[in-house]
């Protein structure tokens, strides 16, 4: 860790040192927004769920334009706009007494999600490169989980449905957490815009390179597909499929589910650094194979929990699922973003990251829909089988992807990683 920190440029240190604090605000509200809309503001459950879906839908719709704007105007400008929308959205949500006002607030929050992913990843990639970039994405992921995990615990202890003002407070705190990245972007990082004004090799200017052109690259298509499948069977199941199976098939308590999420966060935070040292210099596609196998084991454990519902074995299986799944997450997060940014050139980085983000959001939307349908029709065995088949599909796609990327893009470094200082405006 000391060597990594020493290799980072000043801009990278600024970005990384505040990640956990920034995401703590999101953790305060993420698990409780639906509860707030339904139990505090009195919106019926169906309407509350529809309002929540606005975040994902709007995020998906603006990801493409967000990537193009990142390449045209720079990651810094896009992130400032997205963060301002997030702050406004959370302030509105804190006082949203009508569905219309809540809808406007959640659209603003969704807009931020949609434009921030390609923007933030592009900003990181403008600061660090090579194996250092892969390490950065992994450590950033661990810190994000730490912030959200701690925020969730604090929010759970503080929020009380019988005291609406406690929910107002946590949404205002989430808004306030957005002031940290804004201060960084307007202060120490004001010269890092994350934009290449013109490609040095004479290739088409940013406006001439569209998404269809990028998708004609086989490596991009396969990486996008892998990201979609990985999200569909992974994060797309965290908020619906996993809790639904745990309650319906395994018949465990909500406390057990909460403990499982806590174990998931703890393992990511504790193991991410060790995992990064083990995968450094190894082919990223082979790391994805290990991830697929790890997730297959995790889903099998959850399936076994459903065979002995309501007891200690079921609770153990549910918690073990999230623990083993976390190990797979530590393999996924450093590899896919790093590979996407290594495929991109400086003037297309925003759009490459936008494609990855769109695939992620597509999987996050489709995952709960499919899980809800299968579990509603008591097809829990089919559900687990589909998840395991998804793991096999990831392995197959990773092997195909390997044939379409260079050794450098696949994480094999022949020289020490270079460190960029960012592009001055």
Predicted regions and their residues:
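Juxtamembrane intracellular "pre-TM" segments in multi-pass secondary transporters
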Residues: 1-11, 190-229, 415-424
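Helix-loop boundary and gating motifs at the non-cytosolic
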Residues: 6-56, 220-262
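Residue-level signature of mid-helix packing/kink "hotspots" within the transmembrane helices
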Residues: 56-64, 149, 265-273, 364-365
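Helix-to-loop junctions at the C-terminal end of transmembrane segments
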Residues: 62-74, 159, 270-285, 375
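Structural signature of the two symmetry-related core transmembrane helices
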Residues: 77-92, 286-301
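Cytoplasmic helix-loop-helix junction between adjacent transmembrane helices
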Residues: 105-146
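C-terminal membrane-cytosol helix-exit motif in multi-pass small-molecule transporters
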Residues: 156, 176-197, 396-402
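A membrane-interface helix-boundary motif in multi-pass transporters
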Residues: 160-176, 373-392
